[in-house]
Amino acid sequence: MKKGIKIIAAAVAIITVLITIDRIPAIYYRLLSESEQEKTSSDSSHGGILALVNSSHKYVDTGEEKVRLYDKKSDSFFLSTSEIYLDKRAVEPLCKMLDDFKNTTGLRTINVISGARSVQSQKDIYNEKQLKYGYLYTKKFVQAPGFSEHHTGLAVDLALFNSEDGTSEDFDGKGKYSWIIENAWKYGFILRYPEDKKSITGIGYEPWHLRYVGIPHAYYISKNGLCLEEYIDLLQSKSQSEPLKIAVGKRTYKVWHCESKPKKASFSGDNCGGYIAWK
């Protein structure tokens, strides 16, 4: 009898694993498939999901379409204002991730507080922080106007909101909230400013700041402990004949750098004078 119980228990465990695996396509493989068809909306090497914007690489407006997050969201999370906009390619993945976070943890506390910003908005924030905290603090956590990746609409800042008493607090990525940090890559997002990369990114640790780069790239960056700067640098030495190979999901991607817009491949400008291609 005990043997029979063990067999049944083992069968249930196997079924549970299969169900868990079977859930992946709905939240993962379709987004992965869509990332295979990624293109910039212009021929510019300055635009696209892998465009690097930091203190050394100024933002260039290439006309990427931005949409209002309020019009696409569910009730799984909050917005600090209805006028938060994001690059259209980041909207559905973000909503899916936050829906899944709520369904997994039961927490309806995530508050999206920032998305796309104009240069003027960044200037206002930069000046306000300087007046309040001083230059050194501001330089550590806020990019100068024109050099913030918030201009791209591919970056998002999270906070926490308690709907019962109306209080808010910083998102620290700890406890149940670590789910977002650990699973962000499945939706194409990365932790943009890791704690151990301050000397490279030039920005202090920001667990609340996520950047959309697409699933294959997010997977490689996250699993190899890189920041976006390191990933772009790595790809500079990769060519179509000798690409970086990324095995993720059911696919193996070939990723490489090229000087001109590639043909028959998904691509993004790197904002460093070239393009990143993958297929």
Regions found by a protein language model. Give the residues of each.
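Extracytoplasmic cell-surface/polysaccharide-interacting catalytic and binding patches
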Residues: G4-A10, I15-G115, V119-K279
